[in-house]
Amino acid sequence: MQKKIFFWAVIAVGAAGMAQAAVPPQIAKELVTVGKGVCVPETAFLYRPLHPNPPYTGVTILRDISFGPDPKDVLDVFSPEKGGSKRPVLLYISGGAGNKLQGGPNGDVFYDNVMLWAVKNGMVGVNMQRHPGQEWNGPAKDVGMAVQWVNQNIASHKGNPDRVFIWTQSAGNIPTSTYIGHSDLWGPKGVGVKGVLFMSPPAFDILPATPPPVQGGGGFGACGKPTGYTAPAPVAGDGRGRGAGDGRGRGPGRGQVDAATQLARSNLPGLISSKVPFMIAVAELDPPNITSFAEILKGELCKAGRCATYVTFKDHSHISEVMSPDTADTSVTGPILKWIKSVK
């Protein structure tokens, strides 16, 4: 049965590439079964057959480059083997536990796939590892250090330090928005980025705006099993994005604070004043709380005259939206690439 699924998936991908970019129909059906959870192994089971096996061709990869004082402050750089320099740079900041590589069953190419897509589309890719911090803005400081590393070093990897774009997903939105929204975290060249894509953002601090409660909680659901899938035995760090890397700092600086302090920590004023162009995107199968917050964020920015590009990815889930890049399905990457090219 599994072979049959992927036989039709490959056919569908080919058809989508020739006609209209979309989630392959069989995979779209399976994603509905998988549901609105953080279903990494289940979604990787569907998408891994559509990706090449490493080692990859046509790309130079440097892994685990240090960008900060913590041993976990590392990033990967993907650049083309051939071709010129001064390319736009895509800095990817993942969701979940912040891992730049998922690992686990079928997880070996995620999120190399985002980097490979970037290189194939004329960019240099940088994949950042996230980790917890001791202060409320500790993870945001890490984002700032990664941006500064890119600004200072990416020219030697064929990148243009003046055209750096951040693509962040899920939990990665929290430290990214804090970095952009607080100029005291910026480096000597200012914010250091040309644009930011907030993909499937969970609620972050945009006080005084407060997202209304979603009926029934609206959070992530349980994961259904796609056809032919057998769940692996549970292991630590199974890629489901629970635990240490939720994008907020940990330790004594993270605890409960009074209302005035919380308001002062709001990202909204700084997001508005930064003048950085934003794209906000959600998946059709994202849970209601994600979609609700994204729409509120869009509205607050628009009220301030800072309307963001807003996209909903049809048939995609919270996880498939980041596993589909570098396949024939360009329903996610097409709008992203168009937006990047539109930013002057």
Spans of model-derived segments:
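Bacterial N-terminal signal peptides
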Residues: 8-17
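N-terminal cap/lid segment of alpha/beta-hydrolase-fold proteins
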Residues: 23-85
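Mobile cap/lid helix-loop segments that gate and shape the active-site cleft of serine hydrolases
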Residues: 49-57, 193-194, 198-270, 276
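Short substrate-entry loop that stabilizes the transition state in hydrolases
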Residues: 83-87, 96-137
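The conserved beta1-alpha1 loop
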Residues: 91-95, 282
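Alpha/beta-hydrolase
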Residues: 93, 199, 313-316
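Primarily recognizes the serine-hydrolase "nucleophile elbow" in alpha/beta-hydrolase
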Residues: 148-217, 224, 229-234
